[in-house]
Amino acid sequence: MQRRMCVKKNLDMTEGTPISLLWAFTFPTLMGNLLNQVYSITDSIVVGRYLGQTALAAVGSTMPVILLLAALMIGINVGVGIIISRYFGQKNEELMRRAFVNSLYLGLFLSAGMMVMGLTFSGTILRWMGTPEGPLQEATAYLEISFITMICPLMYYLFSSAFRGLGDSQTALYCLIVSVLSNIGLDVLFVAVFRWGVAGSAWATALAQALSAVVAAVLLFRKYPMMRMRRQDLRLHGKLLRQITVLAIPIAVQSAFNNLGNLVAQSAVNLFGEATMAAYTAASRIGTLALMPVETIGSSLSVYASQNHGAGKPQRIRQGVRASLQLSLVVSTVLGVFLLLCGRQMAGLFLAEPSAEILTVVQRFLLITAVPGILAGVMQVYQQVLRGVDRANQALMGGVMQLITKIAVVAVGAWGMRNLDVVWLGWPASFVAGTVIPYFCFQKIAREIETE
């Protein structure tokens, strides 16, 4: 009886119309990610308006580094979500619990290693990236605090991944609302009221994520008694660790590749000076509004594909791909038009007196990278569906091509031609390059699994 009650609360994507199921699952996650992006934009506005252009450039320069070193956590989070969704499709509650526990062990071990690495090499990495002396000290402080508190986002994202693996993106949204609202409140308090500077912004983020992790843990174990750990669940499970690792490593490496591309892009932007760095920080925050929704649709497709793969319904996977492409086209078109019309006005919010140079850089970045968001949507669909059917290595091959293309175009634009527009072309070019291999791999794999 308890099992039926628990399962009924989830979204079972093995039955029903694919486009309706994907939208029902994507919408709460999409709203949550948009809300999270609203926080990111608000954080940059608070830093830019109260601390100035140098502080905004400092915070922006650290983001590729933080995301690069956090790539292993991202891989674990996505991997555990896919595995939990697979065992949910099989109705195997014991393995769902054990997979979650073992992901916690793996994540804790890796986060400790990343914390030590980040504390040791933060200043060196920022100097290697060519960060100007003006924002360097504040950037180093922000980066070091982020790694000291790495355990906070780790725990929060692992619990959120468990909700998503169970098909419950709505509760994950509630936890995100707690994180975003507390983050904005603490950000204003620490930066605008207490005047703790860039360090205050870093501590605000960590404390908000810690609070959200606690809320997520309470909700997970209260709402889903089947996820409450028994003593036997606490043992290390070699087979599950291997499954998580096999999924996590390609995803983590691809995430690292993506962020390595962003790190190279940040290094390229640093060549153009502090004003361009501040403009890029604002532009990348705004541009994510167009790119993040299609990433969310792709992520939802991986859960959909995993559930149907686990349930032995391969014919529904191809239907899910078509539905995801349709959703991506609609969402990316609407948001692309919005940013084209309103991007320059949004950029004016980040600094008290933004220069014409900053506003122009933001506008050109959005026109070239965010407006053609459908290219990113197609790439995400084909990469994510491969992950959902246990073909993460093929998705990784697409990620490698994406990275190589982005770095090559950015390098030509920055170090060869000294032309920012060419640097920005690295984004759409990489989306196209990252699609080719996953597309043809999926066509081949789809035929294979449909005849199994």
Where do the model's predicted regions map?
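Short alpha-helical transmembrane segments in multi-pass integral membrane proteins
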Residues: M1-T26, I84-I151, V193-I249, A305-P372, ...
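N-terminal transmembrane alpha-helices
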Residues: M13-L51, P64-G79, I83, L108-M115, ...
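Transmembrane helical elements of multi-pass membrane transporters/channels
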Residues: A24-D43, I145, Y156, S179, ...
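Transmembrane alpha-helix boundary and packing residues in multipass membrane permease domains
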Residues: T29, N33, I45, R49, ...
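Residue-level hotspots within pore-lining transmembrane alpha-helices
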Residues: M31, L35, Y39, L69-M73, ...
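Helix-terminus/linker motif at the lipid-water interface of multi-pass membrane proteins
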Residues: V38-A57, L126-E133, L189-W196, A256-R285, ...
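Small-residue-rich hydrophobic transmembrane alpha-helices
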Residues: L56-V116, P153-A172, A279-G343, A376-G398
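Short runs within selected transmembrane alpha-helices of multi-pass transporters and secretion channels
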Residues: N77, I145-R164, A172-N183, S201-A216, ...
